[in-house]
Structure formats: C-alpha cells, structure tokens
C-alpha cells in the first residue's frame, strides 16, 4: 500500500531488511514482476538442448535476488537485478521440474541461474538447501508477497518473523496480504511462533 501514513513503516521495513545482513532476498512471482515492470518472458517454440538439473551462471555479485517462478513467466533481461539504494544482485530463479524447458533455455541465454525445487509444486526446504549448497547462502529474507510467505511458513522453511505494521487500511480485496494460502496447498496449516 502506497499511502503517506505507510511511508514511515516502509522506511522501517527497509532498515530492518538492511540490519539483518542477509545476502539473499526471496520474492514470489507477482512481487518480482512488480519490481521489473511486469515484463513477461517471450519464449521460443522449441527449447533446444537443455540439460537436466540446475543451472549456475557465472556472476560477480555477492547478493542474490531469488525469485520463485514455477510457471516460468518472468521476463528477465539479464542475470543482474539493479535497483537504486540496493546492491546489484545476481538473479536466481526457483523452478519446479514441471517448469517448461523453453523457460529454462530462456534463462540460460540471459545468464540467470535457476534451481529445481520440487516435482509438481514448490519444495521450499529443497530450495533453501540448494541456495545454501550452491551459493553459501545462510540467511534468506522471504519478502513476499503473501502467497510465498505462507508457503514457506506452511512447509516449515521459515524460522523467524519480522513484521512491520502501518496504521493504514484501504478495504480493497486486491490489497496485498502478508500471508495467503496458495490454491496449490490443499490443506491449511496452523502456525505459531515458539
């Protein structure tokens, strides 16, 4: 929500994010598309020869923008995420085995790394394991949206919660939520902090 009353909370959120010293930020598909202007991948009809498994592109960046995109729709121009006020970050896509080969080929051509985490649906624990194994990432900030936040919580892949609340409401049904169950997760799962 972009309101004047939420501006201070937004600044506090950025301060907390910086203070946690994580080298990786993780976002869901919709949030990532907002960051890159809604760009959608234009895929070739044929994938060509795409080897099985993960793809680790060469990258000088020591920060990582991790994007969960199991459908294979985000239109990256190259393998670096750039945003004023943040360090350049190497892009890592989290896909599943069912993500189209054409999209994997598209990512390879642009130097975007990707990992496969799950057969038909996202396996958050496998994603976290691979991010640690391949890039030495020990802490990941799962920054939204609500569906990816809840998916990590429900699968037991989140061990800490930092939540900033702003004194603002808009009453819109399209407003982004903090937690939202994915239709792919068939059963709700209660969660509490310990």
Please provide the spans of the model-predicted regions.
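Enzymes that bind and transform nitrogen-containing heteroaromatic metabolites
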Residues: 1-194
